[in-house]
Amino acid sequence: ARLAAVAYDALVVRRAATAFARTSKKTRFEQERPSSPALAQSPSPSKKNVNALCFDLARTDLGNAICSWRDFDAIALDTAMRAAIGKEPIADADADATKETPAPRVSGILQKTTLAAMEHLGLFEKVPAIKKQNVANFLKALEKQYASPEYHSAVHAADVVQAVLFILAPTGLESDLVHRIDPNAVFALLIAASAHDVGHPGLNNAFLCNTEDPRAARWNDVSVNENGHLHVCLSLLKEHKVFDGLPENLRKQCKATIGRLILSTDMAHHTRLVEEFVDVAANAIEAANLGGGGGNYCGSFAHHNRDDGSRIANWKDPTLALCFVLHCADISNPARPWSTAREWGRRVTEEFHKQGDCERARGVPVAALNDRNASGDVDKTTAANQAAFLEYVVEPT
């Protein structure tokens, strides 16, 4: 009976989502026209002509693409920023000459993307107690704490931040989700998105536990990577006094929300998170249809511009909705435009293979997904894996 109820709830939510998508699709794409040819045609970092476009890309205002699903390409922007930083004019007779300097480990893509997202939503005006300079300092330090695995890098974090923004405000209209969430909660969500993989070693939780890594021992084999990300995030938030201007109760609430958000990105929670969200969302829809309103369980995160059941503050567990937004953004890159999605697929495959190399070197069983020796045609294997991920994880979510 419970399975039948869950299935029915899922059907109700899916039908509602489909109806909304049909009515909003035209508006979304009308407002999503490419505003910059350079960004609209961002080349893959592997293309030979990337250097020819790097300076134009680096000079382009990020605001032109920050709210567009098609135009935003974190990989191309990161490549452009690194190339621009790595070229310095030579002060001699040859005015056209340049000298190459080592590419910087930090391009600034995460800081710039997150600040652009916050500014696009007007968060610094809505929450004046949070100072932009403190946030900028936090993000700069945060980006430096990201390691450089192929996939779980600061570039991925920037991609997730922009995906969160697009989910919150796809049309720029009053009907957007962002208007149903308190600005303090939106701040917490974007901070969590920016920090959700900080310090990721390119090795999954199972590997760290199976090899008795010190990090696994520290976090008792529970969401090892995610607990590490949260620890770094909270330490940097305190160091840079990001929430110092908020009342104590709201400061604690923001930190608790960030904690739950980052821990929810552990893929081990995927199935339970989706099931819980469908259940809570269906109940909220039912309560709204019955005119009940659902009650306000959100404390100081309450937002009083809306009284209908779609207002997140009216949900029994409003933070669950934020967790679901972050999770959707975290797994969304296969749904990016083809050239971008293909590069993300290549990167995650290489990260898996490098873990497989570590597994083989440590004498532990090599997971099939991580075994580069068994992959055969890597491109075909990557395509098959990405297609399966889309079918069984991304699309149902």
Where are these regions (language model features)?
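Generic alpha-helical secondary structure signal
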Residues: 133-137, 155, 159, 228, ...
